[in-house]
Every structure is written in structure tokens, then in C-alpha cells.
Swiss-Prot record:
GO terms for biological process: autophagy; protein transport. It is found in: Cytoplasmic vesicle, Cvt vesicle membrane; Cytoplasmic vesicle, Autophagosome membrane; Vacuole membrane. The gene is ATG8. Its main location: membrane. Ubiquitin-like modifier involved in cytoplasm to vacuole transport (Cvt) vesicles and autophagosome formation. With ATG4, mediates the delivery of the vesicles and autophagosomes to the vacuole via the microtubule cytoskeleton. Required for selective autophagic degradation of the nucleus (nucleophagy) as well as for mitophagy which contributes to regulate mitochondrial quantity and quality by eliminating the mitochondria to a basal level to fulfill cellular energy requirements and preventing excess ROS production. The C-terminal Glu-117 and Ala-118 residues of ATG8 are removed by ATG4 to expose Gly-116 at the C-terminus. This Gly-116 forms then a thioester bond with the 'Cys-550' of ATG7 (E1-like activating enzyme) before being transferred to the 'Cys-244' of ATG3 (the specific E2 conjugating enzyme), in order to be finally amidated with phosphatidylethanolamine. This lipid modification anchors ATG8 to membranes and can be reversed by ATG4, releasing soluble ATG8. Transmembrane segments: none annotated. GO terms for cellular component: autophagosome membrane; Cvt vesicle membrane. CDD domains: Ubl_ATG8. The keyword Membrane applies. This is Autophagy-related protein 8. It is a lipid-anchor.
Length: 118
């Protein structure tokens, strides 16, 4: 999936910003979180996050659920490089494995109703 953030900001600018963030906040991870294009789930109000390195994927999902005001019966799935990361994995390990060459970790999210309602 193409990242709108990548389309809107040139590589050099993204790389410089990620480096600045990592220098200033060594214990934080710069994350870009965007909705999967064809998903009917709510669009998030901000794309850029500075996530504590010791946060788990599950805890990050909770943050996203809150930001999009997702009701408890709705499912949300997050993807890193189009793969579901393990819920218990630390964001720091996901970052080390999947960070983009610009220094950001790109996460996409999608949803479906777990009870099959339209």
C-alpha cells in the first residue's frame, strides 16, 4: 500500500525528521499510522506518533482504537509491511525489523465487524 505520508513529504525531509526525533527522544519510536484505503473503519485524526519503545503492539492497538473511537464489538487489525505483527511484540523490536529507510515505522490499520453486521 502506498503511504499518503510518503507521497506528501519528500524522502530527505522525512529522513531528517526521523533522525531529529530519534536524537531528541532516544526511547521513543517515530510511527506513521494510516488507514488501509478500502477499509470502512474510521480515519484516524493524526498520522504521526511518538511511541514508547517498551510499548507492546497490543497497547498501540488500544491507542489507535481510542483515537478513532472504535466501539468494543468492532475489530481492528494493524499491519506492518502487510503482515499482522504479534500482539505481545514490543514496538522497539517491530521498529528494528521493519523501519523504513527514512527512519519511520509505517503501520496501516483496517477493520471489520466481528459480528458480521453490515
Amino acid at each position: 500500500m502506498r503511504s499518503k505520508f510518503k507521497d506528501e513529504h519528500p524522502f530527505e525531509k522525512r529522513k531528517a525528521e526521523a533522525e531529529r526525533i530519534r536524537q531528541k527522544y532516544a526511547d521513543r519510536i517515530p510511527v506513521i499510522c494510516e488507514k488501509v484505503e478500502k477499509s470502512d473503519i474510521a480515519t484516524i485524526d493524526k498520522k504521526k506518533y511518538l511511541v514508547p519503545a517498551d510499548l507492546t503492539v497490543g497497547q498501540f492497538v488500544y491507542v489507535i482504537r481510542k483515537r478513532i473511537k472504535l466501539s468494543p464489538e468492532k475489530a481492528i487489525f494493524i499491519f506492518v509491511d502487510e503482515v499482522l505483527p504479534p500482539t505481545a511484540a514490543l514496538m522497539s523490536s517491530i521498529y528494528e525489523e521493519h523501519k523504513d529507510e527514512d527512519g519511520f515505522l509505517y503501520i496501516t490499520y483496517s477493520g471489520e465487524n466481528t459480528f458480521g453486521e453490515a
